[in-house]
Every structure is written in C-alpha cells, then in structure tokens.
Amino acid sequence: MLRGESYNSRDERLLTTAHRARSLLATFTATPSTDSAQRRAILSELLGEVGEDVWIEPPFFCDYGENVYIGTRSFVNFNCVFLDSAEIRIGANALIGPSVQLLTPSHPLRAADRIVIAESLGENESPYRTHALPIRIGDNVWIGGGTIVLPGVTIGDNVTIGAGSVVNSDIPSNSLAFGHPCRVQRSL
C-alpha cells in the first residue's frame, strides 16, 4: 500500500487500524476546543507525527491516521479529509483551508482493471483494485478552502494554492497556483 502497489482495503490489519482511527476521531470531535491538552494527546495517538502548536479543527477525517505527518505551527481548518493510504507529509507553518481533501488512493481507470470478479474474491477481499501514492506539502504553504490534492502530488515550499483548485501535478516552490486543473500563475 505505502509503496504504490495495489492493496486490499479490506485487509484485517487495515480494517483494525481504520476502526481505531474512527474511534479516536470521534473522541477528538467530542473533545471541547478549550481542552487543547486532551485534543493534542488524541492527535499524537492518531497521527504518525504531529509537530508543536499544530491545530486541527473538527470535524476532521482520515482513513488510518498513522500515515499523516504534520509539521510545527500548522493549521488544518474544519471538514478536511485526509485519505492516508500512503503517506501525507505536511511541512511547518502550513495553512490548510476548510474542506480541503488530500487523497492518496486511486483506482485503475478502466472498469475491467478496477473491478475484481466476485467468484475470485476471498472472504475479506475488496472487489475493487486500489493503489496509493504519497502527497507531500512543503513548509509555509497555504492551501485555500475546497481544494482537492490528488495522489502522488508534491507541493513545494512557500506556495499558495487558490481556493477550489484541483491539484493533479507537482507545484514548484515559491509559486501562486490555482485552477481546475491547478496551474502555476506566477512566482512569489
């Protein structure tokens, strides 16, 4: 899964990790924002790494949590979705706007390649082929609300991504980029 190879999303270990993440996310969401120590403890247990002074506004959603790494002084706004079937690495001082989606998993484009014939499935096997590629976000990045970042994308340092963008390719450092698809508009 973490190497970009096809994986079974119904694997017993993955399901156990996903159920654990959902339980921690429910507790995180129910914890008052005034109890920052408890919220931080939950994030430290949930995520692969959480830097100092990281703030995540609930609701927040992730698949497993253990593949998410967030650098110091980063802020994740309301309603963000991090599908972390591969690593999601966010640098320091990042601002992630509301309803941003960081999506590492994908599926083959052709239905014949994507769908597994039911007769050949084992008991705990997914009927869909899935693979994942990592997402990397540099330091000092601002991703505007409603942006979708697709599998395998790297966003460099000091980048601003405009709201509502669909980022399907790498964005170099020191850039302003936006659009559907997201394209560099100018250097910063």
Question: Where in the sequence are the language-model features?
Answer:
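Residues at alpha-helix boundaries and short interhelical turns
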Residues: 32-33, 64, 84, 171
